């Protein structure tokens, strides 16, 4: 088994991305990261994605990741059992926040449960029409809002703008994923607003959201972000400006699951480098 496939397709990489995104939020708000929450996010992400990919039905097109999943379903089961066990222990440790964490877990489950080909889960495919915003909202909740709640950060105007900024970045990335998955969603009767739009309309929505992302970034620059922090904040948005054309024309698993997923954590990664090499 190639380690790079295990790292990306085994959901280790995306789990690390989630942790780095949370670290970025903690450090942006000048609070000490909660180690238990970071561990919870890592294992909860591993649980969610292992469950999601284990349920992913067969598709007609060739996919390197899907082939890997077929060949390693038993390994995904082990990853799921290990991660859900760790998540349960960490949920007990974080029991003061049990309600909000449980609600977040439920929202995440609903997203993946639509892949289960049995009633009542099939019904979920008909209502997740705002799939793009739904997924971006879950990521924003986990990586920005929950760190603020756990750290008891005041929901100031700057915090709200930062939350919107992160949502817009993630939403733009989700647009590309949903455009790629439109044929699979049609086959599986999953309602997907992006899949129903023409490419011209998708392009307008994509760059409109990127424009709002840059506007919110400038607003943060006027509210205490220094120039280095501002450049770190906008760098993934700059890369997304030049990534639209290739993203809609390729189905490369590495492009989507390494590059585009990595853009979600890029600001956090750069911020950590800034801290290590001030």
Task: Give the ranges of each region predicted by the language model.
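Hydrophobic alpha-helical transmembrane segments of membrane proteins
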Residues: 6-14, 20-22, 39, 162-172, ...
């Amino acid at each position: 088994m190639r380690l790079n496939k295990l790292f990306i397709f085994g959901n280790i990489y995306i789990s690390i991305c989630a942790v780095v995104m949370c670290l970025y939020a903690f450090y942006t708000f000048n609070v000490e990261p909660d180690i238990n929450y970071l561990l919870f996010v890592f294992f909860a992400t591993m649980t969610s994605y292992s469950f999601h990919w284990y349920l992913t039905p067969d598709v007609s097109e060739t996919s390197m990741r899907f082939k890997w999943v077929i060949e390693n379903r038993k390994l995904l089961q082990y990853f799921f059992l290990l991660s859900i066990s760790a998540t349960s222990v960490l949920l007990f440790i974080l029991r003061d926040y049990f309600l909000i964490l449980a609600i977040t877990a439920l929202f995440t489950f609903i997203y993946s449960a639509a892949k289960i080909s049995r009633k009542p889960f099939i019904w979920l495919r008909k209502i997740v029409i705002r799939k793009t915003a739904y997924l971006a909202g879950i990521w924003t909740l986990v990586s920005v809002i929950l760190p603020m709640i756990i750290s008891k950060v005041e929901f100031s105007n700057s915090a709200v703008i930062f939350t919107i900024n992160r949502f817009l970045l993630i939403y733009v990335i989700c647009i590309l994923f949903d455009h790629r998955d439109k044929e699979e969603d049609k086959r599986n009767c999953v309602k997907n607003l992006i899949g129903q739009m023409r490419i011209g309309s998708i392009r307008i929505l994509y760059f409109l959201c990127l424009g709002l992302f840059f506007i919110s970034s400038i607003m943060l620059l006027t509210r205490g972000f220094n120039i280095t922090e501002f450049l770190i904040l906008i760098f993934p948005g700059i890369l997304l400006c030049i990534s639209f054309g290739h993203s809609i024309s390729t189905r490369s698993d590495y492009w989507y699951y390494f590059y585009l997923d990595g853009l979600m954590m890029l600001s956090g990664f750069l911020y950590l480098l800034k801290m290590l090499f001030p």
